[in-house]
């Protein structure tokens, strides 16, 4: 993590909140193939349930003291005592993670390939998370002065949850605070209490029934791939060119079942789909040398270009009359729609010089010029520089 001005100025306008430098795993040249399998099994739960909430007897006593006891059958209600923390949070939500990797190399090649699967139930009832991940890092020596490589990652993830509704009082976290202890979410036969038959006594929706009848699913695909070539045409000079592509595709599907009475026999569906593509090219030249074994110099110049594009759509229709046919085309009216588009580009030039005297004194200077389509029309370029001594 880079936070100081001297370290981050070389990254320009986008480094105002710091820079995170990530080093990916890779194999070692000349090392035999090594296969590694890891697995993780466990569970997650609410860190603490020691919340001082009223039970039914305390709630009844409170209502009597403040005059809210009119029309209440407390003899019947006193037989019900619901801890809503136990109803809307999973006590031990299971998780499982499996990872298989292979790494190694020859005299001219190193590689690291891995795949993983992660599955977890959320601590909130009705939520799940699933992810599949693949990664491949390969580097090869073309000759004595040139090496090429690629780092590629693909991720698929799926999230299931419930819509939180217009007011969110029946969302899991809110429900644990606002539902009263004598509001039983279940009938005597174990099925969910509903407003339809009067089995639900709450003044808002039954949170568990709402979650079941208003599901929301999200899916995300992400592909990040980087290709690079690094040359050392002469001693102490390193030239590197790198091209990366970051692509993401996200979809969501929300359904509101018409058979659920709070939906007023009026189903709904919402679909959204968004695509993002970020292309980046970076070229750098780095020259380092030493004089008299105590004076160390390092100079670097570079160029970077970024082209970003994001677009998608979101459509909501209402009027579905069948719980099975809750797609967009089954609705009678389109209640909302949108199609956002975002585009911008960057072009940057930068340089840095470093001096080190006998590992005792250090000085550096960096400068960067950023040109961006997001800057004002009267000033498309910005300069960023820093000087440091130590």
Language-model regions: role of each:
Residues 49-50, 56, 88-92, 102-106:
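Outer-membrane beta-barrel initiation region
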Residues 1-36, 95-97, 110, 116-118:
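A beta-strand signature from Gram-negative outer-membrane beta-barrel systems
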Residues 29-82, 122-127, 133, 137-222, ...:
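Surface-exposed loop/interface segments of Gram-negative outer-membrane beta-barrel transport/assembly proteins
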Residues 24, 100-104, 134-140, 225-231, ...:
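Residues on the lipid-exposed face of transmembrane beta-strands in outer-membrane beta-barrel proteins
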Residues 15-17, 276-278, 382-384:
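Short, solvent-exposed loop/turn segments at the edges of secondary structure
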Residues 134-136, 241, 281, 349-353, ...:
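Extended, hydrophobic alpha-helical segments in both membrane/secreted and soluble proteins
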Residues 39, 115-121, 363-375:
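Transmembrane beta-strand segments that form the barrel wall of outer-membrane beta-barrel proteins
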Residues 95, 99, 119-120, 349-350, ...:
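Conserved interaction-surface patches within small, structured recognition/assembly domains
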């Amino acid at each position: 993590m880079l936070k100081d001005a001297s370290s981050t100025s070389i990254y320009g306008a986008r480094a105002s909140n710091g820079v995170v430098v990530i080093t990916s795993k890779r194999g070692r040249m000349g090392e035999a193939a090594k296969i590694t399998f890891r697995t993780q099994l466990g569970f997650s739960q609410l860190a603490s349930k020691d919340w001082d909430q009223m039970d039914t007897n305390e709630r009844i006593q409170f209502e009597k003291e403040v005059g809210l006891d009119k029309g209440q059958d407390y003899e019947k209600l006193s037989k019900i005592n619901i801890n809503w923390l136990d109803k809307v949070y999973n006590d031990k939500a299971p998780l499982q993670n499996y990872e298989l990797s292979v790494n190694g190399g020859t005299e001219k090649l190193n590689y690291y390939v891995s795949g993983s699967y992660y599955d977890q139930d959320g601590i909130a009832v009705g939520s799940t998370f699933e992810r599949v991940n693949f990664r491949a890092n390969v580097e090869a020596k073309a000759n004595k002065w040139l090496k090429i490589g690629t780092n590629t990652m693909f991720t698929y993830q799926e999230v299931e949850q419930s819509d939180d509704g217009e007011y969110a009082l029946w969302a899991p976290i809110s429900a644990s605070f606002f539902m009263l202890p004598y509001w039983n979410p279940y009938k005597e036969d174990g099925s969910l209490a509903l407003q339809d038959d009067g089995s639900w006594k709450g003044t808002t929706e039954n949170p568990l029934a709402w979650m079941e009848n208003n599901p929301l699913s999200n899916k995300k695909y992400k592909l990040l791939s980087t290709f690079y070539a690094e040359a050392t045409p002469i001693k102490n000079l390193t030239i590197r060119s790198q091209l990366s592509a970051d692509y993401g595709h996200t979809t969501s599907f929300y359904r509101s079942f018409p058979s659920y009475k709070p939906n007023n026999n009026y189903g709904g569906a919402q679909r959204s789909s968004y695509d993002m593509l970020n292309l980046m090219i970076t070229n750098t030249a780095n020259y380092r040398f030493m004089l008299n074994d105590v004076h160390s110099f390092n100079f670097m110049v570079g160029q970077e270009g970024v082209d970003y594009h994001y677009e998608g759509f979101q459509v909501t229709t209402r009027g579905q009359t069948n719980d099975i046919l809750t797609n967009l085309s089954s609705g009678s009216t389109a209640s909302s729609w949108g199609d956002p588009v975002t585009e911008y580009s960057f072009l940057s030039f930068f340089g840095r010089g470093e001096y080190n005297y006998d590992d005792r004194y250090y000085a550096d200077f960096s400068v960067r010029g950023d040109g961006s389509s997001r800057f004002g029309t009267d000033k498309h370029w910005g300069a960023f520089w820093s000087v440091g001594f130590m």
